[in-house]
């Protein structure tokens, strides 16, 4: 390699290392910045548990569309009633 190419490669590598070392690191609380001590760590975990609990709560939505009764369902009910009348037994 020519000395200019080696110098350029070294400069690019140095720039890449400096950029990587000086970049923002994430704290244990999954939020940027802040100190990493044990007290904040416990608070962060408790905060995460609260957030997950809020996400886990389900919301109930009612169906707004009208679903007509199926004719087959009505026919099945009529046949069951007819069979019960003929046999004299009641469905359990």
Swiss-Prot record:
The modification Pyrrolidone carboxylic acid is found at residue 24. The modification Glycine amide is found at residue 33. The keyword Cell cycle does not apply. Its main location: secreted. It is found in: Secreted. InterPro entries: GnRH (IPR002012), Gonadoliberin (IPR019792), Gonadoliberin_I_precursor (IPR004079). Keywords: Amidation, Cleavage on pair of basic residues, Disease variant, Hormone, Hypogonadotropic hypogonadism, Kallmann syndrome, Pharmaceutical, Pyrrolidone carboxylic acid, Secreted, Signal. The record marks 26-31, 33-34 as: Cleavage. One of its GO terms (biological process) is response to prolactin. GO terms for cellular component: axon terminus; cytoplasmic side of rough endoplasmic reticulum membrane; dendrite; extracellular region; extracellular space; Golgi-associated vesicle; neurosecretory vesicle; perikaryon. Pfam families: GnRH (PF00446). GO terms for molecular function: gonadotropin hormone-releasing hormone activity; gonadotropin-releasing hormone receptor binding; hormone activity. Residues 1-23 form the signal peptide. The record marks 26 as: Appears to be essential for biological activity. Stimulates the secretion of gonadotropins; it stimulates the secretion of both luteinizing and follicle-stimulating hormones. Belongs to the GnRH family. The 3D-structure was determined for the synthetic analog Triptorelin. It is linked to Hypogonadotropic hypogonadism 12 with or without anosmia: A disorder characterized by absent or incomplete sexual maturation by the age of 18 years, in conjunction with low levels of circulating gonadotropins and testosterone and no other abnormalities of the hypothalamic-pituitary axis. In some cases, it is associated with non-reproductive phenotypes, such as anosmia, cleft palate, and sensorineural hearing loss. Anosmia or hyposmia is related to the absence or hypoplasia of the olfactory bulbs and tracts. This is Progonadoliberin-1. It comes from Homo sapiens.
């Amino acid at each position: 390699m020519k000395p200019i190419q080696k110098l350029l490669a070294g400069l690019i590598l140095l720039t890449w290392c400096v950029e990587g070392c000086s970049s923002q690191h994430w704290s244990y609380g999954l939020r940027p910045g802040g100190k990493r001590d044990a007290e904040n760590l416990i608070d962060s975990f408790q905060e995460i548990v609260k957030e997950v609990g809020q996400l886990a709560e389900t919301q109930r939505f009612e169906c707004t569309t009208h679903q007509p009764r199926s004719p087959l369902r009505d026919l099945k009910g009529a046949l069951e009633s007819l069979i019960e009348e003929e046999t004299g037994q009641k469905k359990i």
